[in-house]
Amino acid sequence: INTLILGRNHGTVMIAEESTAWPKVTGKVEEDGLNFSYKWNMGWMHDCLDYMKLDPYFRKNNHNKMTFAMSYNESEKYILVLSHDEVVHLKCSMLNKMPGLEGDKFKNLMAGYAFMMGHCGKKLLFMGQEFAQKQEWSEERELDWYLLENPEHKKIQNWVKELLHLYRRN
């Protein structure tokens, strides 16, 4: 089905949200692959979030959480996703996952986004993450756009914009 859809619809992207180590998800059908455009890198997402949630004092023995995904990066065409699944059902917003005082949270989030943009793979942020939405996401309300009146939230939005420009240029 992926071959059919990708062949008929120029510009279409098929992404597999796959959490096992199933091989060749992005491989060609002729090579026993499933022919998805990208595979969601669930391992990177969980490891990165686990690391970013740690108080910096405790990170020194956990750097492997930030580097492990590089050991298997060439096995598939990955997309790095920070999805809605991570900001619902009492899991906190991205900003509120970060340790420390409010100023520390913003700096941590900026560092996390910079790491994501520098890591191999395509990128995908869920809505509201680009300006550090404070509340968990809910389909029952709109995003807190008023937060962009706050300089810290505007700074995050501009940071993400600059990171995306840098990413697209390289």
Give, region by region, the residue ranges found by the protein language model.
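Catalytic cores of secreted or luminal carbohydrate-active enzymes
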Residues: 151-170
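Conserved alpha/beta catalytic core and glycan-binding cleft of carbohydrate-active enzymes
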Residues: 1-140, 147, 165-168
